[in-house]
Curated annotation (Swiss-Prot):
Pfam families: PRK. GO terms for biological process: CTP salvage; UMP salvage. Keywords: ATP-binding, Cytoplasm, Kinase, Nucleotide-binding, Transferase. This is Uridine kinase. InterPro entries: P-loop_NTPase, PRK/URK, Uridine_kinase, Uridine_kinase-like. Pathway: Pyrimidine metabolism; CTP biosynthesis via salvage pathway; CTP from cytidine: step 1/3; Pyrimidine metabolism; UMP biosynthesis via salvage pathway; UMP from uridine: step 1/1. Its main location: cytoplasm. GO terms for molecular function: ATP binding; cytidine kinase activity; uridine kinase activity.
Length: 211
């Protein structure tokens, strides 16, 4: 084991390409000890609420996330202790009763729209990235994802974007850009920026005597 696991935070608007950047970095270090944690698995449990109330939840607001639970898990992983990662059911709009066992690794990638919003999370990170992508492209990606992966209708996705996602992005997500060590324009298509990130991460790992 090395001195301490390295935590990389990757933030950005919904549909910005965060997941693509995360996967690209993950693939570069696939032969090493690395894991990914998605912030949106840590939405608050809503099983106590009627389904109709869950439908009205603002999932783009910082209060939608159970950051206490997420921080607890990150701290466990930093101490090389295993966790039971939650599963979020997007069709039922609540946390599943099932979990995923996760073993500690030397590199932890934490990805989500608001991972840079909470100072407690930022303080756990060795590197903070913000994926910056044009709003038109982000909404197209979100429509495709929510229809294909989350069983949503196009009308509901667009209505949610206009009434919730866009204002929440402007109010909470975009401002976290100032906390980023590095801003990656054009998301997962920016291979030059991703290669630079990989080099920087390798340097941090070497300093921590992990590689």
């Amino acid at each position: 084991m090395g001195k301490s696991p390295v935590v990389i935070g990757i933030a950005g608007g919904s549909g910005s390409g965060k997941t693509s950047v995360t996967r690209s970095i993950y693939e570069q270090f696939k032969g090493h000890s690395i894991l990914m944690i998605q912030q949106d698995l840590y939405y608050k449990d809503q099983s106590h609420l009627p389904f109709e109330e869950r439908l009205n939840t603002n999932y783009d607001h910082p209060l939608a996330f159970d950051n206490d639970y997420l921080i607890e898990h990150i701290q466990e992983l930093l101490n090389y202790r295993p966790i039971e990662k939650p599963i979020y059911d997007y069709k039922l709009h609540t946390r599943s009763e099932e979990t995923i066992p996760v073993e500690p690794k030397d590199v932890i990638i934490l990805e989500g729209i608001l991972v840079l919003e909470d100072k407690r999370l930022r303080d756990l990170m060795d590197m903070k990235l913000y994926v910056d992508t044009d709003a038109d492209l982000r909404i197209i990606r979100r429509i495709m994802r929510d229809i294909n992966e989350r069983g949503r209708s196009i009308d509901s996705v667009i209505e949610q974007y206009v009434s919730v996602v866009r204002p929440m992005h402007n109010q909470f997500v975009e401002p976290t850009k100032r906390y980023a060590d590095i801003i990656i324009p054009e998301g997962g298509q920016n291979h030059v920026a991703i290669d630079l990130m990989v080099t920087k991460i390798q340097t941090i790992l070497e300093q921590n005597a992990i590689l």
